[in-house]
Amino acid sequence: MRTAKDAGALERAALPAEGGLSGAATRLVERLLDVGIDGKGPFDPAHEIAANVLKHARGDADEALRIIARDHRQLGAVGGFVTGLGGFFLMPLSLPANVLEFYLLATRMTAATAKVRGYDIDQPEIRSAILLTLAGADSEDILKKAGLHAAGGKLSAVAFDRLPAPALMVLNKAVGFRLLGRIGQGTFARLGRLVPFVGGLVGAAVDVYMLNRIGKQAAKEFPPVATFGR
């Protein structure tokens, strides 16, 4: 008989309260949506980033996407902004600050990309597609196990099926499980920041590389609204 421990991310997300890990996955997703997309304190919301960059790029969406990706890579290399968000708000996650920084930046970069391309990032299905983009190759497995087809991209798999709110919540939580599962490896890569000079450079390089990959994937997953679904 399979237990919750043996189940995959989607199956575990659909289970009732699973204890600490289940709660951690839920809290991580909530923070990514609430802070990464909607903003908090010094961390500007994705829609504001998109509007300002589009204005700076004089309406050129492609140039705006380049600026968004560049700016977030630079922030990823510097880090440190999480300390300004407030310990009480972030404490329940019990995650290393640099790991949370990375995921918040990746979430906002993806959401801003979607906004520039014409999507309503307040819609639940779009927000789920943003989270799925963070999961990378793992998202295909999540969608497959949910009975959705990702041939046209994660966005089309989620949007075209018009999933009800409970199903979207399960998908979001499954992404949370996958991201938490990566934290051990990601934290190891970033522990180099504790070592002066060389270690810090290695940690920054890892974040920049990963943000660059996610930025390219976001541009692919969120084509211009005028061409979406064709």
What residue spans do the PLM features occupy?
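Terminal, membrane-proximal amphipathic helices
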Residues: 1-81, 107-230
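Conserved phosphate/anionic-ligand binding catalytic regions in large, soluble enzymes, centered on
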Residues: 79-100, 197-203
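Active-site metal-coordination segments of metallo-dependent hydrolases
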Residues: 99, 103, 119-120
